[in-house]
Structure formats: C-alpha cells, structure tokens
C-alpha cells in the first residue's frame, strides 16, 4: 500500500465542505474591497525565491531540476509569484493593482499543529501605492476577513522593519537581517534559548537587555507608541512612528481599532518586508501561533527586474485558522448527503428513474440515483447510512397510474406523487 507523502493531507467530503465555507467567506470579503482573483503557476524558477524570501524559507524549498536541467521550485508563498506576474505583464497598468488569491503552498518543514508541508493560504497584494492609506486598507481587510468567518477573539499585532533597522543601528549591529531573524523567533524559543541565540549573535549584556526591552514594547497603540517615542531618537524612527500614528488613526475610521495592537518585536520571516509588518494571533489550546500575517515590501518588484514599485499585502493561514474555528464551533454543519435518492424497482424502471433524477437535478435539487443494482431493502439501508432526506421509489405498478412513492427517511412517512408534479413536490418538501 502506498501512503500519502508526509506533511500532506487528504480532504474528505465533510472537510471540503467546511474548507469551502471558509474560502467563500474570505473570498466574499476580499471582493467587497475591490480585489480581483489571480492564480500563478505552482512551480517557479528557484531563483525567484532565492532572491529575497529569506534564509529559512529558501532552506525549506521543494527545489529540483526539471528534465531540461532548469532549477525550479514549488512555491513557498504567493507574494514572490504575484510580484513576478506584475513585472512580466502589468507594470504600465493603472494603479493601484488589487489582486487576491486562494492557493496551496509548499515548504519542507517539520509537520506540527497547524503546520504542513502542503498548506493553503488566502491573501491579497496591493501594488502601486506607498501611502499609509494603502497599509490601512490592507490591514482593515485582514481584520474583516477573520471577522467574516465568525472569529472575534484575535488581535492583529503591528510592527515595523524600519524601526528594527534603527534599533540595530542603536546597538551598533551591522547584520540587521540576522538580528531580525533572531527577534522573529522570540515567541518560538524558550527565553533562555532566545538569550543564548542573541549571545551567539555577538550581543553583550547591555545589547541583550535592550532587545528584551524592545520585544516587551507591545500592547494597545495609545499606550505603546509613546514608549516607542522614548526609545527611538533618530529622525528616521520618528517619521516612522508618526506613520504608525497615522495608520492607527485610519484604522479607527475603518472601525477595526479594537483588534489592533502594536508589537515592535515582530519581524516576520521574509526578508522582502521593508516597513510595516503585522500578524494575527488567536488564543487557542491547540498550540497554534500566528494565523496569518503580512506587510509592506517596497523593494521586491525592483529586485525582480521591475521599476521601483511600492506594495503591501497579507496571507491568511487556512490550516491554522480552520482548527480554531472548529474548536469554537464557528463553522456551521452543512448537509453533504444528496437531498433525494431515486430507486428504480426492476430493469424496466431505470430509464424512468433517470428521467426523474434529471428533472430534479435541472431544478437544482441534489439527487443521487441507485447505481449498484440493490434490492429495495438494501437501497433503503444505504439511504439511511448516507443521510438522504427523501427517497423516490419508482415501481412498475405505481408507474401504470403515473405516480411514484416518496418516502421521508427520517419519519418513514410515504406519499404517492404524480410524476409530473415531482419537482414541485420536492421543492416544497425540502423546504420544511
């Protein structure tokens, strides 16, 4: 027996109904903000991801040579692919460009709660605006996308890579990206291991204390931003803090400020982020951390050969979101069994059964027809097992009178219904 590949999953019908429900809630919200759907190839040239994705992501690539000897990889995220698409075809298009996607990604990492080697994300990319209004629009949509699924207990924590750059300069650190990678692991490592990582990086006791001070600057914007003003003194940092104040002001107008927190220790794992970054956290007992994140990446398009173009976006982690929604009972139970099961009694009734099933299907009624040649009793057993609501029994004697027998599988009640009236009867019967 061949097993499925480690870190991947098979989704059964019951699970697919739940996933589709979540996808549609999010898709609906994306489209109300004017975003349009795109989909890029599952494979890209490996160089695309090596340029600016970050050391950890590059290590996790599913990378290989194709039969032509070209280095290709399965996509680990969509932002790089969307940026490549923009550079290839849309540089002269009217701005801003507002695209969304719902797609699968691949990373070779150790499977754990909410983490798989194949996983799905739903995200948006807003290309062409460097304005704080674009950041606010994207973060507001990020919040509203979770709200659309019924989730209420979560926060969106906002940090800033420019402030982290300035912090590195304050410490005299030249390898700011290296420091950010360690800071990004602050919630993934025990504090002792985190401090040891900072020591190995080369920070002295004073530098480590400064880092610990920084990562504890988090909380409600009105409380935290004044603390940031005290910590940072450079003109660059002050300008960026003013941008954060402006962002929070706009998010209040979007009516999402209640979900917003500031966390200056957020770095995010991708090297392409340039300023504002953010991630969503929902309290849970499942061992799941961030359920999505994003930020501004103003240099990525230029790295891929395009003209300098600002951009921002986010991705929602579907594999992390769904278990939390399930644990909170937020995904409704959806009927996956057919509404109607048509059972012909005898060989001569098969075509009649097909015609009845066809008329019901054309009317939008989910209908299954008996295909296994079962006798009536076994057909009824099957109908009960799969949860069919109504069964139509097509018998020769009934047909002579132009009727069929409709059985309610829950109550056992039976009705004779004229074949010509069956569609209307079923529509009414299924409403109750």
Swiss-Prot record:
It is an enzyme of class 6 (ligase). Keywords: Aminoacyl-tRNA synthetase, ATP-binding, Cytoplasm, Ligase, Nucleotide-binding, Protein biosynthesis. One of its GO terms (molecular function) is histidine-tRNA ligase activity. InterPro entries: aa-tRNA-synth_II, aa-tRNA-synth_II/BPL/LPL, Anticodon-bd, Anticodon-bd_dom_sf, His-tRNA-ligase, HisRS-like_core, HisRS/HisZ, HisRS_anticodon. One of its GO terms (cellular component) is cytoplasm. It comes from the Archaea. It is found in: Cytoplasm. It catalyses: tRNA(His) + L-histidine + ATP = L-histidyl-tRNA(His) + AMP + diphosphate + H(+). Its EC number is 6.1.1.21. GO terms for biological process: histidyl-tRNA aminoacylation; L-histidine biosynthetic process. Pfam families: HGTP_anticodon (PF03129), tRNA-synt_His (PF13393). Belongs to the class-II aminoacyl-tRNA synthetase family. This is Histidine--tRNA ligase. It comes from Pyrococcus furiosus (strain ATCC 43587 / DSM 3638 / JCM 8422 / Vc1).
């Amino acid at each position: 027996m061949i097993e499925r590949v480690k870190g991947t999953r098979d989704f059964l019908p019951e699970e697919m109904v739940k996933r589709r429900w979540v996808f549609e809630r999010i898709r609906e919200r994306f489209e109300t903000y004017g975003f349009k759907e795109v989909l890029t190839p599952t494979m890209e040239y490996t160089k695309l991801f090596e340029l600016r994705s970050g050391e950890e992501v590059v290590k996790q690539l599913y990378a290989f040579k194709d039969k032509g000897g070209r280095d290709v990889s399965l996509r680990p995220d969509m932002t790089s692919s969307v940026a490549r698409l923009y550079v290839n075809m849309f540089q002269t298009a009217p701005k801003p460009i507002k695209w969304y996607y719902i797609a699968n990604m691949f990373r070779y990492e150790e499977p754990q709660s909410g983490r798989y080697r194949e996983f799905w994300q739903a995200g948006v990319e807003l290309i062409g605006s460097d304005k704080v209004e674009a950041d606010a629009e994207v973060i507001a949509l990020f919040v509203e996308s979770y709200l659309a699924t019924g989730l209420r207990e979560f926060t969106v924590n906002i940090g800033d890579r420019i402030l982290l750059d300035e912090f590195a300069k304050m410490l005299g650190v030249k390898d700011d990206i290296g420091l950010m990678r360690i800071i990004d692991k602050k919630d993934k490592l025990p504090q002792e291991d985190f401090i040891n990582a900072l020591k190995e990086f080369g920070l002295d006791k004073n530098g480590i204390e400064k880092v610990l001070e920084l990562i504890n600057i988090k909380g409600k914007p009105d409380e935290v931003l004044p603390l940031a003003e005290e910590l940072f003194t450079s003109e660059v940092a002050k300008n960026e803090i003013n941008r954060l104040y402006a962002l929070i002001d706009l998010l209040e107008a979007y009516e999402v400020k209640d979900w917003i927190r500031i966390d200056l220790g957020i770095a995010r794992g991708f090297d392409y982020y340039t300023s504002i970054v953010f991630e969503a956290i929902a309290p849970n007992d499942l061992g799941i951390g961030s359920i999505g994140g994003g930020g501004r990446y103003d240099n990525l398009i230029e790295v891929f050969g395009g003209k300098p173009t600002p951009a921002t976006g986010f991705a929602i982690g579907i594999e992390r979101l769904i278990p939390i929604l399930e644990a909170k009972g937020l995904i409704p139970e959806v009927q996956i069994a057919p509404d109607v099961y048509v059972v012909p009694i005898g060989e001569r009734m098969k075509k009649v059964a097909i015609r009845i099933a066809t008329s019901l299907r054309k009317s939008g009624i989910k209908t299954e027809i008996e295909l296994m040649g079962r006798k009536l009793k076994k057909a009824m057993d099957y109908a009960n097992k799969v949860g069919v609501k109504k069964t139509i029994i097509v018998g020769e004697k009934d047909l002579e009178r132009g009727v069929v027998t409709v059985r309610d599988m829950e109550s056992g009640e039976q009705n004779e219904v004229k074949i010509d009236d069956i569609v209307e009867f079923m529509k009414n019967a299924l409403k109750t």
